[in-house]
């Protein structure tokens, strides 16, 4: 996470390992009365290092291993964190008019955390626990 420069805008950078190479991204999330929207763009390693100089020192990098998969056309992501041996966060991409996703076989859903501030990346960056 980067130090805020505008009210209602959260900025962050991300390094993602993809095979033997790294990809870098800059993201802004804007909050308005109508809701929130996020824009993300790829950046160079040099830009990533420059943005690191703007890091919010009250927060930590959120390290995780992300698993992506599809079942019956439904996309899922599971984030596994080194600071939690017993819990992970699963996300399902839902089409606009879709109902709740089917739980993949072999996965136990402990509870629904959509919208729960305790499971937002910004909180994980602050406290490093689930």
Which residues make up each language-model segment?
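Phosphate-end processing signature that detects enzymes handling 5′-triphosphorylated RNA
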Residues: 1-130
